[in-house]
Regions:
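Short, well-structured N-terminal submotif of metal-dependent ribonuclease cores
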Residues: 1-38, 51-62, 116, 120, ...
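Acidic, PIN/NYN-like endoribonuclease modules and their adjacent C-terminal/linker elements
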Residues: 1-3, 46, 100-129
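Amphipathic alpha-helical segments within well-ordered protein domains
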Residues: 45-48, 83
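Conserved glycosyltransferase catalytic-site signature
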Residues: 8, 41, 96-97
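Internal alpha/beta domain cores that form substrate/cofactor-binding pockets in large enzymes
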Residues: 61-64, 68-77, 81, 91, ...
């Protein structure tokens, strides 16, 4: 079974049927349904902001639970890898670097994102949409 890391943009789109990436994010997660799905804690927190504002945090947690998605904590090696990525790619935001660093540190087969600016940052990045 492969490991797939999920960016906040994918979970945000999955949780919001009006999101422009909703269908593509849903299809991508279905295509990786046999994989072990993980999301960095930083991306998980980012994806939960809208549901928290709407009083739908329990719903969002249930979706993550139904996907058997593991929330991966930030570790010193991941933080250091993210800092190195951020230093090399000045336009890359730190939250994005944390997701990519998580994927590379865990040797993920895929890192799913809706952010086209991630193309070419890591071989495992798959831009959805």
């Amino acid at each position: 079974m492969a490991l797939t890391v999920v960016d906040a943009s994918i979970l945000i789109a999955l949780l919001d049927s009006d999101d422009g990436l909703h269908a593509a994010a849903t299809a991508a997660l279905l295509a990786h349904a046999v994989d072990e799905l993980t999301i960095p804690a930083s991306a998980y927190s980012e994806a939960l902001v809208r549901p928290a504002r709407a009083g739908r945090l329990d719903e969002a947690r249930a979706v993550v639970g139904a996907l058997l998605m593991e929330v991966v904590p930030l570790s010193p090696p991941i933080a250091e890898a993210a800092a190195t990525l951020r230093a090399r790619h000045q336009a890359l935001r730190l939250p994005d670097a944390l997701v990519i660093a998580t994927g590379t540190s865990l040797e993920a087969g895929s890192i799913l994102t809706g952010d086209t600016r991630w193309r070419g940052l890591a071989a495992s990045v798959e831009v959805v949409g």
